[in-house]
Swiss-Prot record:
Its cofactor is Mn(2+). It comes from Syntrophotalea carbinolica (strain DSM 2380 / NBRC 103641 / GraBd1) (Pelobacter carbinolicus). Keywords: Aminopeptidase, Cytoplasm, Hydrolase, Manganese, Metal-binding, Protease. CDD domains: Peptidase_M17 (cd00433). Disulfide bonds: none annotated. This is Probable cytosol aminopeptidase. The active site is at K279, R353. Presumably involved in the processing and regular turnover of intracellular proteins. Catalyzes the removal of unsubstituted N-terminal amino acids from various peptides.
Length: 497
């Protein structure tokens, strides 16, 4: 999508459709009064009849005839004016994008009926553009024939502002939205790739491409080196698949040369059948999404590089496939991790924590200032929080607070769960240093307790995105498939710094 920022009166734009963001019960602004005159009172009639009052997600479309240069005008409700809500604005823009697609609009304009209260214009524009970009995502690369039922996507968007002095800031906000939207789309694309295409090497090759595109450095450890280094937990999970594992490392250096990096670790199980502890067949097709943590890390690295954030980052992705076979690891096995600690395997479907154990240990070699891991780790997280929030655990309250704040801003919300020492007894083994599952009670917490044993001596947070990484039905902001969760969260966190 091409996005152009300009300073001109909104109602003078010649376009297929002019979108106007309208705040709830604020339908009497000068711009809307001018529009009502051009529409011969049609807007006023709609307001009087309560057909449109500017509530979040409301839309109202007018055919303008000869009254305006724009062929159509679309009003989109943005919710409360006095307490402008970024989530409501993002969803309002997404609903607008849905109407544009239904109308087969290829070029549109976007303006606000008035500047928001308590929110910078630049932030408002960024959020609206994010909503349009997220709503315009489509995964159609495997369609071999043109689908007439799929409407065209918006090709050109004109952002209209009234104040010439805001032009530079708004243009920068649009660029921020573009880089973030691209990062989310990258993450969604990776999650949506089918398992027959998405091997560990596929992820490694995509990381190499990303490094070339974004000016990152990339290192890929292949099986022989993983064996030589002693990645016993990662290799155990991978041994059931004919497709060998990879450990992928991406580095971004935007901060001072002597600044310690923030390590981002993303679970990269490209397909998870459960291994010998086989999952039920129903919805197993969705387990191509078990690398959504890796996808989020890739997307965040892309966005951070595009935004030229002044930080140093290292991304670590253990990439494996978990399948049953004659060579697969078994319940009852005892494996030795990269840390040297031994793990009794009780369930081969608790594989994510095993590969993360080695990845977290490896992260310590970079002497990070903090580590954040993201993983579709436990079904128990969905039972606890549903699909509205991800679970967060941390060994530092300040890091947890910063992440929760970023979750509110990005609307990729987090809920902190406890990590008390008393949970450790559930993963205590009598024949090894620990076991890989603590049973059904507090399953999300005991998985985090397991990971904590492998964390370097630094601030750490674990984010369980099992309930938020996949959209089962489709919404205005996201079609069915991968959500790209984590990208906006991480960028908001980094921008806080």
């Amino acid at each position: 999508m091409q996005i152009v920022v300009g300073c001109m009166p909104a109602l003078t734009l010649k376009t297929d459709c002019l979108m106007l963001g309208v705040w709830q019960d604020r339908t009497d602004t000068p711009l809307l009064k001018e529009l009502d005159t051009a529409l011969h009172g049609a807007l006023g009639q709609s307001v009087d009849s309560k057909a449109f009052v500017g509530k979040e997600g409301e839309t109202l479309l007018f055919q303008t005839g000869a009254g305006l240069p724009a062929a159509r005008v679309l009003l989109i409700g943005l919710g409360a004016y006095a307490q402008a809500d970024c989530g409501a604005m993002r969803r309002g823009a997404a609903e607008g994008a849905r109407v544009l697609q239904q109308q087969r609009v290829k070029r549109a304009g976007l303006a606000l009926s008035e500047a928001p209260a308590g929110l910078p214009l630049t932030q408002a524009v960024q959020v609206l553009v994010e909503g349009l970009l997220l709503a315009s995502y489509r995964f159609d690369r495997f369609l071999t024939q043109k689908r007439e039922d799929l409407p065209p996507l918006l090709e050109t968007l004109d952002i209209l502002i009234a104040d010439q002095g805001s032009l530079e800031g708004v243009a920068a906000a649009v660029e921020r939205a573009r880089h973030i939207g691209h990062g989310v789309a990258l993450a969604r694309d990776l999650v949506n790739q089918p398992g027959n295409v998405k091997s560990p090497e596929f992820l490694a090759e995509r990381a190499r491409q990303l490094a070339g595109e974004c000016g990152l450095s990339c290192t890929v450890l292949e099986q022989e080196q993983l064996e030589r280094e002693g990645f016993g937990a990662l290799l155990a999970v991978a041994q059931g698949s004919a497709r060998p594992p990879r450990l992928i490392v991406l580095e971004y250096r935007g901060g001072a040369p002597d600044e310690k990096p923030l390590a981002l670790v993303g679970k990269g199980v490209v397909f998870d059948s459960g291994g010998i502890s086989l999952k039920p067949g129903e919805k197993m097709d969705e387990m191509k999404m078990d690398m959504a943590g890796a996808a989020a890390v890739f997307g965040a690295m892309s966005a951070a590089a595009g935004l030229r954030l002044p930080v140093n980052l290292v991304a670590i992705v253990p990439a494996v496939e978990n399948l049953p076979s004659a060579s697969a690891y078994r319940p009852g096995d005892i494996i030795t991790s990269l840390s040297g600690r031994t793990i009794e395997v009780l369930n081969t479907d608790a594989e994510g924590r095993l590969i993360l154990a080695d990845a977290l240990t490896y992260a310590g070699r970079f002497e990070p200032r903090a580590v954040i891991d993201l993983a579709t780790l436990t079904g128990a997280c969905i039972i606890a929080l549903g699909h509205e929030a991800s679970a967060v655990f941390s060994n530092r309250d300040e890091l947890a607070r910063n992440l929760i704040r970023a979750g509110e801003t990005s609307r990729e919300r987090l809920w902190q769960l406890p990590l008390w020492d008393s949970y450790d007894k559930q993963i205590k083994s009598e024949i090894a240093d620990m076991k890989n599952t603590g049973g059904r009670p507090a399953g999300t917490i005991t998985a985090a307790a397991f990971l904590q044993r492998f964390v370097p001596d630094c601030p750490w947070a674990h984010i369980d995105i099992a309930g938020t990484a996949w959209e089962a039905k489709g919404t205005a902001l996201c079609p069915r498939g991968g959500t790209g969760v984590g990208v906006r969260l991480l960028i908001d966190l980094l921008e806080q710094e």
